Amino acid sequence: MTEPAILVLEDGTVFEGDAVGANGLSVGEVVFNTSLTGYQEVLTDPSYAYQLVTLTYPHIGNTGCTDQDDEANKVWAAGLIVRDVPRRPSNWRSQISLSDWLAARGVVAIAGIDTRKLTRILREKGAQHGALMAGEIDVDRAQDAARQFTGIKGMDLAKVVSTKQAYSWYEGQLDLDRNEWKRAAPQYKVVAYDYGVKLNILRMLAERGCDLTVVPAQTPVDEVLALCPDGVFLSNGPGDPEPCDYAVAAIKTFIMRRVPIFGICLGHQLLAQTVGAKVVKMRHGHHGANHPVQDLRSGRVMITSQNHGFAVDEATLPSNVRVTHRSLFDGTNQGIELLDVPAFSFQGHPEASPGPHDVDVLFDRFITMMAAQS
């Protein structure tokens, strides 16, 4: 027999369903993601910290879960909201069902609700503060928790999810035929700032010959320069970039030293912020694996994976910055490059996981940039 569960929004809307994870109470910003698959990668993506993730596809959990698909060493999403979870997964790689995986990792989750109705609310009203409660239900307590949540705006979550110690990374992507991780001969020394980095980003860099040192978000610039890097990578991550003054200070120095820079997601916003641009909170953000983005230089349209609730305000970019990519959903900025130094960034996720690989050429561009600089 399943336990009851509820989702309560800050506007007072209550959804009743069944618990499909751990019992308890969890609060966060309620967002929706349109990906059909990749639920495990989504939940373990540090960019989803303090977010209650609604998956719009009705059947979630069909392929179970496997340790190889984690994007971090824990679940970072605050909770999961779905329409239906199958009783039995079917996939040759599956090690455990989604429900058991959620329970084992202490994730509060709800199934059996009208996710279409919820998504319409989020589209019309914007991302909502919410509370998930499973097991012993107290609607008033859940509603109070939802309304007391202060929101992600103004929260510096990069230093919360970041690694506490520097480490090296050499592992490439998974070779499914051999069931082993690929390796490549290291050619370029790259320091990756961990603002909430996904493992597949590190794998794609390592596979292209990057000798990676991953450092905490607040690592002083002098410690990084002492490693004599050929390039610096600015990772994805959760929260608002505005409070991350420590990151802006470091990036300014790398720009002055002309160290090649590549940023993704939060790293993109931090690069833009460093050169003087403003970053604004979006109404409901971009979360999904089917977002069309146009390369303004070639005119090519690429389908991309997206996960962000803030966007760079193009009108505030200085004259020495060129806009390279733009969303075809809402026209928001998706990429920039500095004209006078070797630095560029992309708002979406070229590493996918989950999603298409249309934009993985950006990793190759970073390699080419370091080769030219050296």
Swiss-Prot record:
Q: In which pathway does it act?
A: Amino-acid biosynthesis; L-arginine biosynthesis; carbamoyl phosphate from bicarbonate: step 1/1; Pyrimidine metabolism; UMP biosynthesis via de novo pathway; (S)-dihydroorotate from bicarbonate: step 1/3
Task: Give the protein's function.
Answer: Small subunit of the glutamine-dependent carbamoyl phosphate synthetase (CPSase). CPSase catalyzes the formation of carbamoyl phosphate from the ammonia moiety of glutamine, carbonate, and phosphate donated by ATP, constituting the first step of 2 biosynthetic pathways, one leading to arginine and/or urea and the other to pyrimidine nucleotides. The small subunit (glutamine amidotransferase) binds and cleaves glutamine to supply the large subunit with the substrate ammonia.
- Any one of the GO BP annotations: glutamine metabolic process
Recorded hits in Pfam families, A to Z, give: CPSase_sm_chain (PF00988), GATase (PF00117)
Can you name this protein?
Carbamoyl phosphate synthase small chain
Q: By its UniProt entry, which NCBIfam families does this protein fall under?
A: CPSaseIIsmall (TIGR01368), PRK12838.1 (NF009475)
Catalytic activity reported: hydrogencarbonate + L-glutamine + 2 ATP + H2O = carbamoyl phosphate + L-glutamate + 2 ADP + phosphate + 2 H(+)
Q: Which SMART domains match?
A: CPSase_sm_chain
